[in-house]
């Protein structure tokens, strides 16, 4: 199982803090550093010193890291025009030497959209816009150099786009699609994604979502084993109960309920939960790190958890669901 670090900078983070976490994750052997793409703090926090742009951040990290993969979990389709996003991602892919992954979603945080004057249509329309965004981005990247790309949809029209720049990765940077929706999310993942991610679900939720997306792959004639399945879980690991409680308090979480909600407890307890996620079909886990100043937390997981799960394989498609 691959372990990746996932951060929520809208809750309050500077670029330098994100850089420190990304570099610590790289040094610790984690597979990737991902960040959310939000502009407003959640849960009543002040979010000081204020939001940071996801793709500006990743462009900076691309030049200040060397091996770790970088991405968003996830970029909202409502935030950026698809052709502009294709340019941004391709540029950061080049800046990183081919280490970028693009997580895309419909967008869900209504208050964030109203705060920044971003239109927030119905869920159905947001799914329609996400579909067009995926068609446009993959179409631009797949267009041969020297040819132009045109597209006519209900929400977006492109006329003779030069389809440049091209990403470094071939055929393109991996695309991550996530969410717990029962119909359109699995369908889009089966059609476009290299990875399907379920954020913050129970083991039963993970098992059900993976079964759905694998069935959707079969429906479109795709081998389900070609789609990576992953889960995102909050991380709160400590050497003993006191350290777990201290870290839970630092992120405003109840240590009594955290084990049921995420990857919480001693290293052995976190390893056991990761084994359960693998049995549910996940071959990759995103560890949501909420205290960006606690780099000892990452070091503990890198030393005592990562080596125990690196060879852990996900359950095969026919043994899940």
Which residues make up each language-model segment?
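Active-site-adjacent structural elements that line small-molecule/cofactor binding pockets in enzymes
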Residues: 1-321
């Amino acid at each position: 199982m691959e372990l990746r670090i996932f951060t929520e900078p809208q809750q309050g983070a500077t670029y330098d803090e994100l850089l420190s976490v990304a570099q610590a994750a790289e040094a610790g052997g984690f597979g990737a550093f991902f960040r959310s793409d939000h502009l407003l703090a959640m849960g009543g926090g002040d979010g000081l010193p204020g939001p940071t742009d996801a793709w500006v951040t990743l462009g900076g990290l691309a030049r200040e890291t060397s091996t770790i993969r970088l991405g968003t979990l996830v970029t909202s389709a409502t935030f950026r025009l698809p052709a502009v996003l294709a340019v941004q991602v391709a540029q950061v892919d080049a800046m990183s030497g081919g280490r970028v992954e693009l997580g895309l979603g419909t967008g869900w945080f209504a208050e964030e959209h109203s705060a920044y004057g971003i239109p927030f249509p119905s869920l159905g329309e947001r799914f329609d816009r996400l579909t067009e965004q995926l068609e446009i981005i993959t179409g631009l990247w797949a267009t041969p150099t020297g040819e132009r790309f045109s597209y006519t949809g209900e929400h977006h029209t492109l006329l003779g786009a030069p389809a440049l720049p091209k990403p470094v990765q071939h055929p393109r940077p991996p695309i991550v699609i996530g969410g717990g929706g029962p119909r359109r999310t699995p369908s889009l993942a089966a059609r476009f994604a290299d990875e399907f991610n379920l954020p913050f679900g129970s083991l039963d939720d993970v098992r059900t979502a993976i079964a759905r997306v694998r069935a959707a792959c079969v429906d479109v004639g795709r081998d389900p084993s070609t789609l990576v399945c992953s889960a995102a879980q909050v991380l709160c690991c400590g050497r003993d109960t006191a350290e777990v409680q201290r870290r839970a308090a630092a992120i405003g979480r109840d240590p009594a309920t955290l084990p049921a909600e995420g990857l919480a407890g001693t290293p052995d307890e976190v390893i056991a939960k990761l084994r359960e996620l693998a049995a549910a079909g996940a071959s990759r886990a995103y560890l949501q790190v909420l205290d960006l100043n606690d780099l000892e937390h990452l070091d503990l997981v890198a030393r005592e958890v990562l080596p125990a799960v690196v060879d852990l394989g996900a359950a095969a498609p026919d043994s899940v669901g």
